[in-house]
Curated annotation (Swiss-Prot):
Catalytic activity of the protein: ATP-dependent breakage, passage and rejoining of double-stranded DNA
InterPro entries per UniProt: GyrA, GyrA/parC_rep, Gyrase/topoIV_suA_C, Topo_IIA-like_dom_sf, Topo_IIA_A/C_ab, Topo_IIA_A_a_sf, Topo_IIA_dom_A, Type_II_DNA_Topoisomerases
Family: Belongs to the type II topoisomerase GyrA/ParC subunit family.
Gene3D superfamilies named among the record's database cross-references: 3.30.1360.40, DNA gyrase/topoisomerase IV, subunit A, C-terminal, Topoisomerase II, domain 5, Topoisomerase, domain 3
Role: A type II topoisomerase that negatively supercoils closed circular double-stranded (ds) DNA in an ATP-dependent manner to modulate DNA topology and maintain chromosomes in an underwound state. Negative supercoiling favors strand separation, and DNA replication, transcription, recombination and repair, all of which involve strand separation. Also able to catalyze the interconversion of other topological isomers of dsDNA rings, including catenanes and knotted rings. Type II topoisomerases break and join 2 DNA strands simultaneously in an ATP-dependent manner.
Name of the gene: gyrA
Protein name: DNA gyrase subunit A
Motif GyrA-box per UniProt: ranges: 537-543
Additional observations: Few gyrases are as efficient as E.coli at forming negative supercoils. Not all organisms have 2 type II topoisomerases; in organisms with a single type II topoisomerase this enzyme also has to decatenate newly replicated chromosomes.
Active site: Y134
Organism of this sequence: Mycoplasma genitalium (strain ATCC 33530 / DSM 19775 / NCTC 10195 / G37)
Origin: domain of life: Bacteria
EC number: 5.6.2.2
UniProt subcellular location: Cytoplasm
UniProt-recorded Gene Ontology molecular function terms: ATP binding; DNA binding; DNA negative supercoiling activity
């Protein structure tokens, strides 16, 4: 017991005499955490605003520099660089150093490479670099500009971790690396995310700032267009770009570069560039996952055809899918489109500062001024030292006999130095230089060289003094140096900036506005084709296999419109349905198309009789005509809310069907033709405007068994084209047809015979259009109406198309090409021939 008490007393005595202090745990935690946080911020996660480098990047570059791994020297093993950096400057894991070095050698990670790598340094698919013992590296040519003049006291050096080496606190950085290559990092309580930019644009921005220090971020935006990422892709110009230029924070929307290609049997989305920091393999896996989960439909196949030439990701589209709509879904659901958050946080004088674009350029510019001043002072000191020595050498050369005598008489060097000082006022440095001078330097030629060198040094010294005294001259020199960098390393943008495109994705925002041909077969198969799919042929041409159809099917409708036009489908039952033109999948001339029932909710026994396009509902009318001659006029704006499920467009008797619908302007003359070759002409204002669901009135008087087979207006031309089923047709001036009241019998226009066959269509034209004729076999002949001579009434006409046995002319379409605005217009002038 006594022994234990002695031990307790001894412990108390030791505690009383110890240096242990009582402290607050909360205070100690706060202090330790702040030390750790600042260490991470300053020494690990954030780049210096002056050279754009974190300590580990700077150490790798400087380690390669002092190791002689320059761009014009042979490659050396990566392990050599990693080992040197780890042993001298960065006492951390070798993989951290190697990963840093590898990233600076990856063209998909850095916009401007700082390491010239030889071997496998990873891929955009997420493949890791080969082991450091296999790969080789050296500094890139551009990296040498970061280290340029580092041996001329341009930056401060500090001791390394063990005090045996010196390392730079910042690099001279002859180009704005922070903005050129960007940076990203996560510190404690803060992070940085700086996008890369185009070097040429940055230099233009710096020159603008030098010339006009008061320039605004809007003015900088005129030369620095926005980010320029290593992987290219498209950048959608949004307020986010302006925001980070002004405040240092914002969002950049990056969208993959995708082209729609036509393969042999279907369309394909071909991805050639993807957003920065997107893993291609992960992207493909995500698309496959969405297809399996049935969240995205319409993809037939996906394959990666990427090579050394670049990315090529092919996504084959199913035949019944609109490629633009599928692309829209992929942009929404995958990383084909991403947002890059910009937070331009960097170290300024050792503290983290959020910089806007102008401030980042100003910090770099201040650094360049500091580098130039320090370099100039260093050069000035060296030149002044050399000038001082040259002055002594020239004195000695001019008094060489006395100098030689003094040296010969002197007992030692110090006595010679003292004598030279006394005799010629040479200080110790000059005297030592004289003693070290070789005899050959005493020749006349060498003396002249010394005099020339002295004169050049004098001029250079004066220039250095001017530079140090004149900031304008400093800025001029910096501009010249930046221009040299631009001339040598400047390049074109990789990322294209898209203006006037919304970042909000909708189907039509991705669909190019272009003119297309819309076709529909008798059985209701729809197809969208390019307007250049048909070649002009002369009258009587046999045609090409223009529009393939299924067996027992033929073409019934064809028109040209914009991809952004509304398409209105009018059916024989008097209903109307509406979709957008781009909703019809793109196809080839020889494709069969897709059923209309896939796009509109048409009934099984319902047939589409007219297909019209509308861009503006504010002006104009729809003019309806039934098979039995009932007509009606209704304003376009009554059809603006029509959807794909359809609505009633006209009412009529049970034994009647809707024949055709055309657009009118309110002051047109209407021409209605019959199967027996009669035409009635009357003014549309004879009909009052009726509601959408109203019934009409009689427009033409028909005999029993006679039906309407033509509907057109005077605004479509001054000639009347009449075409028979056997390919016989003619042109007649509309002046030959008198203006009558509606519901008249009309005037005979085509003499119907066995040679002509029943009249297929009667329509007005100008005479300078192209005529597209579609046969029952799906062949198309395009010929100019200018080749067709004008004839009188009640004649049979001439041969327009050569038809084979059992082949008949089924549809006629007029094709207009407006040369002034390059827009293609097409007037749908006929309907499928009435079966006799």
């Amino acid at each position: 017991m006594a022994k234990q008490q002695d031990q307790v007393d001894k412990i108390r005595e030791n505690l009383d005499n110890s240096t242990v202090k009582s402290i607050s745990l909360a205070n100690e935690l706060e202090r330790s955490f702040m030390e750790y946080a600042m260490s991470v911020i300053v020494a690990r996660a954030l780049p210096d605003a002056r050279d754009g480098l974190k300590p580990v990047h700077r150490r790798v570059l400087y380690g390669a520099y002092i190791g002689g791994m320059h761009h014009d020297r042979p490659f050396k093993k990566s392990a050599r660089i990693v080992g040197d950096v780890m042993s001298k400057f960065h006492p951390h894991g070798d993989m951290a150093i190697y990963d840093t070095m590898s990233r600076m050698a990856q063209d998909f990670s850095l916009r401007y490479l700082l390491i010239d790598g030889h071997g496998n340094f990873g891929s955009i698919d997420g493949d890791r670099p080969a082991a450091q013992r296999y790969t080789e590296a050296r500094l890139s040519k551009l990296a040498a500009e970061l280290l340029k003049d580092i041996d001329k006291d341009t930056v401060d050096f500090i001791a390394n971790y063990d005090g045996e080496e010196k390392e730079p606190t910042v690099l001279p950085a002859a180009f704005p690396n922070l903005l050129a290559n960007g940076s990203s990092g996560i510190a404690v309580g803060m992070s940085t995310s700086i996008p890369s930019h185009n070097l040429s644009e940055l230099i233009a921005g710096l020159i603008m700032l030098i010339d006009n220090p008061q320039c605004t971020f809007q003015e900088l935006l005129t030369v620095i267009k926005g980010p320029d990422f290593p992987t290219g892709a498209n950048i959608i110009y949004t307020k986010g770009i302006e925001s980070y230029f002004e405040t240092g924070k914002g969002n950049v929307v990056i969208r993959s570069k995708v082209e729609i290609e036509q393969l042999q049997t279907r369309s394909a989305l071909v991805v050639t560039e993807i957003p920065y920091m997107v893993n291609k393999t992960t992207l493909i896996e995500k698309i496959v996952e969405l297809v399996k989960a049935e969240e995205i439909s319409g993809i037939a196949d996906i394959r990666d055809e990427s090579s050394r030439e670049g990315i090529r990701l092919v996504i084959e589209v199913k035949r019944d899918t609109v490629p633009e709509v599928l692309l829209n879904q992929l942009f929404k659901s995958t990383r084909l489109q991403v947002r890059f958050p910009v937070n331009m946080l960097a170290l300024v004088k050792g503290a983290p500062v959020l910089l806007n674009m102008k401030q980042a350029l100003e910090v770099y510019l201040d650094h360049q001024i500091d580098v130039l001043v320090r370099k100039t002072k260093f050069v000035l000191n060296k030149q002044q030292e050399r000038y001082h020595i040259l002055s002594g050498l020239l004195i000695a050369a001019l008094n060489i006999d006395e100098v030689v005598a003094i040296i010969k008489k002197s007992a030692n060097n110090q006595e010679a130095i003292n004598t030279l000082n006394t005799k010629f006022k040479l200080d110790e440095i000059q005297a030592k230089a004289v003693l070290d001078m070789r005899l050959r330097s005493l020749s006349v030629l060498e003396v002249n060289k010394l005099q020339t060198e002295q004169k050049e040094l004098k001029d250079s010294i004066e220039f250095c003094k001017k530079v140090l005294a004149d900031q304008k001259l400093q800025l001029k020199i910096i501009k010249e140096e930046l221009q040299k960098i631009n001339d040598q390393f400047g390049d074109e943008r990789r990322s294209e900036i898209l203006y006037d495109i919304s970042e909000e994705i909708d189907d039509e925002s991705l669909i190019k506005v272009e003119n297309v041909v819309i076709t529909m077969s008798t059985n209701g198969y729809l197809k969208r084709i390019g307007v250049d799919a048909y070649n002009l042929q002369h009258r009587g041409g046999v045609g090409v296999k223009g529009l393939t159809t299924y067996v027992d099917d033929s073409i019934s409708q064809l028109l040209v419109c914009s991809t952004h036009s509304d398409l209105l489908f009018f059916t024989d039952k008097g209903k109307v349905y509406r979709i957008r033109a781009h909703q019809i999948p793109y196809g080839f001339r020889t494709n069969k198309g897709i059923p209309a029932v896939n796009l509109i909710k048409i009934e099984k026994d319902e047939r589409i009789c007219s297909l019209l396009s509308v861009n503006n509902y504010d002006d104009g009318y729809f003019f309806f005509c039934t098979k039995n001659g009932i007509v009606k006029r209704t304003s376009l704006n009554e059809f603006i809310n029509i959807l794909s499920n359809g609505k009633r467009a006209i009412s009529f008797d049970d034994n009647d069907t809707l024949y055709s619908v055309i657009k009118t302007h309110g002051n047109d003359e209407i021409f209605i033709g019959s199967t027996n070759g009669f035409v009635v002409r009357f003014h549309e204002n004879q009909l009052r405007v009726l509601s959408r669901t109203a019934r009409g009135v009689f427009g033409i008087s028909l005999n029993k068994g006679e039906f309407v087979n033509g509907l057109s207006t005077s605004s479509n031309g001054s000639l009347l084209l009449s075409v028979g089923q056997n390919g016989i047709g003619k042109l007649t001036s509309i002046d030959k047809y008198r203006l009558t009241k509606r519901n008249a019998k009309g005037v005979k226009t085509l003499r119907v015979t066995d040679r002509t066959g029943p009249v297929v269509t009667t329509t007005t034209v100008f005479g300078n259009e192209d005529l597209l004729m579609i046969s029952s076999a799906g062949k198309i002949v395009r010929t100019s109406l200018q080749e067709l001579s004008e004839q009188g009434k009640n004649t049979s006409g001439v041969k327009l198309i050569r038809l084979k046995d059992n082949e008949r002319l089924e549809r006629v379409t007029i094709f207009k090409e407006e040369l002034e605005d390059k827009e293609m217009q097409l007037e749908d002038v006929g309907s499928k021939q009435i079966t006799q």
